[in-house]
Amino acid sequence: MDQLVTDTNKSAFKLKNFGPVYCINLDGQPERWQYMQSQFNFWEVDNYERISAYDGRDDDLSDIIKGKYPENMTSGEVGCTTSHLKAMKHYLETSDSPYAIMMEDDCSLDLVKFWNFKWTDLYAYFPYDWDVVQLAIICTGDIHVRLHKRFVNDFSTACYVINRHHAEKLVRFHCRGDKYKLDQGVKPRA
């Protein structure tokens, strides 16, 4: 990472107008937030904000759940899901951007240097009826390099773009004030 900070990035133009980015980070992991800030600085991404994540691994999150605690989710999945909903809600309350980029604090931007396109080119290629476009996946061995409909093994919440309409729909469906309603059969795959 030290090399990343000291080198001049001749590919930074590829992420021009990338954002707003909402980076989800646990309070107890400041080193991961520093890592993300280093990447954003290296790539000259300045439209980003940290979202304090809910930690479901050790904490009982029943105080932020409205209704029945979801039985088909682990506590970590509840923390992840509610953190993403919190980020979406914050985006809707603080920005008028037509889209937001949701990114977790372990997402690497290293491969951007190999892009033969710019962010604005990719964004222009989104289908007219898009809701969410996944920018990072958990690699299961098959890598699809073209924009495509979701495959069964393409899952991850590491980094995705969500449009305002879809974020509004998810927040309307799952947020009740400062609480989250997840008893409608939600089963994340992250």
Regions found by a protein language model. Give the residues of each.
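An acidic/histidine-cluster motif and surrounding catalytic segment
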Residues: M1-M103, C107-A190
